Amino acid sequence: GVDINAIETTENREKFRLRMKELGVGVCEGSIATSFLEGKEIAQRIGFPLVIRPSYTLGGSGGGFVQKAEDFDAALNRGLHASPIHEVLVEQSILGWKEYELELLRDGAGNVIIICSIENFDPMGIHTGDSITVAPAMTLPDTVYQNMRDLAIKMMNGIGKFAGGCNVQFSVNPDSDEIIGIEINPRVSRSSALASKATGYPIAKIAAKLAIGYHLDELGNAITGSTTAYFEPTLDYVIVKIPRWNFDKFVGADRKLGLQMKSVGEVMGIGRNFQEALQKACQSLEIRRNGLGADGKELTKQEELLRSLENPSWNRLFHIYDAMKLGISMKTILSLTKIDKWFLLQIEELIELEKEIEKYEVGTIPASLMRTAKEKGYADRQIAHLLNCLESEVHKKRKEMGINRV
């Protein structure tokens, strides 16, 4: 299992930075502060905006981005108090960079496999537990992925020779493809649970057996029943995870998302494509939405939408859809959210499809259009809203067309 030195290296921010530099892995410029005065000196040297990351905390507790000098004192005090050893890392901000995760497993013989790549829909600046995530990564070029894979294995080997699971987080500059190591979790984590469900690979079970001395090639593959656990899963489907917040029960809570995790759970959608998985995840949230739009609950005030796009909250995904429907330009949405254009184009495609569906009635909609809508994750209730009819009528029409659930 994981040894104490690996935990010490990954949880102590300064030791992590120094070890990554020794391994040749890029890290953000920054330094450790154990007092208020040290933190002030580092901030003056690095400049704003910057990030405060307390040592030995979970869920990003006490951390945050600081845009202006006048907000720094309160943020630094908060971070120092959150850390049980009164220590924070003050580092340069990479707000807006793309964020990725890799799930790894290693045995005592040094065999390493990558179980899954995970891409954050939201850019750097939002805790990964509060970010919509997609598996496998959608916008990662193969050359960058191969570099990231090599770095992840180097990082895992560099923090100790333990056997078990490991989660490695990276940030990638969208303009230059520069890769920076954010953190390593040398354990089965929240992301491991997602990767396990997404791939069907029993990460926790295998990691436990590796920790007591088994090797990957000695363990059976529960899926095939004939091969070993020494393989890397390949997905022909897409997983979308959307966090679930419960701000209504916490009156007065700050709903803006940042480095400190605020979600209380999550849902997962599975589809043959990103759009289908996204719609299914939205339908599973239990927030009285039929999916991503097509339910008459769109926000139509431009000023509120622009403010929401710039200041991420739990409903920003829905507001991106609303902004596109209202005619706010792709350039503006891209500039305010820093979300990869590929994801935004996927949402734009859904809006164009809805416009096409609205041209018909339930009796005249072509079977090809109905099939396309279902393949992109639309529920019967959403299609009924677009056709201005009852859900039961859409269900009946779909059955007549021979379009059934799989």
Residue locations for each model-derived region?
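ATP-dependent carboxylate activation and anion-phosphoryl transfer catalytic cores
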Residues: G1, L23-G24, I46-P49, G59, ...
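Conserved hydrophobic/aromatic pocket- or pore-lining residues that grip, position, or stack substrates
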Residues: R53, I333, I383
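Short, basic interhelical loop/turn and adjoining N-cap
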Residues: S335-L345, A384-K397
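A conserved helix-loop-beta module that forms one wall/lid of the active-site cleft
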Residues: V2-G63
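Flexible, Lys/Arg-rich cytosolic regulatory linkers and terminal tails that connect or flank
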Residues: E8-E14, K399-V406
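Extended, domain-scale alpha-helical bundle/helix-rich regions
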Residues: R371-K376, R381-C389
